[in-house]
Swiss-Prot record:
GO terms for molecular function: small ribosomal subunit rRNA binding; structural constituent of ribosome. Keywords: Chloroplast, Plastid, Ribonucleoprotein, Ribosomal protein, RNA-binding, rRNA-binding. One of its GO terms (biological process) is translation. It is found in: Plastid, Chloroplast. It comes from Physcomitrium patens. This is Small ribosomal subunit protein bS18c. The gene is rps18. InterPro entries: Ribosomal_bS18, Ribosomal_bS18_CS, Ribosomal_bS18_sf. Part of the 30S ribosomal subunit.
């Protein structure tokens, strides 16, 4: 019984959206794109990002464009 209460309480919490309403997903917005790639330079999954599927698609396209234009690295091998 206690677990059921905890689960319902946990699901009722609203998290802040990862992208604010004024932010535009664009390949030139490097600060925004860096929040959605790992330390190795990989694109984080949609579950980790808490993005909608449409936002994730736009984010992936923007990150790939930024990589091609050398605004973001393909890999981050600083070891």
């Amino acid at each position: 019984m206690k677990q059921a209460i905890n689960k319902s309480k946990r699901s009722s919490r609203r998290r802040l959206p990862p992208i604010r309403s004024g932010e535009i997903i664009d390949y030139k917005n490097i600060n925004l794109l860096r929040r959605f790639i790992s330390e190795q330079g990989k694109i984080l999954s949609r579950r980790m990002n808490r993005l909608t599927s449409k936002q994730q698609r736009l984010m992936t396209i923007a990150i790939k464009r930024a990589r091609v234009l050398a605004l973001l690295p393909f890999l981050n091998n600083e070891n």
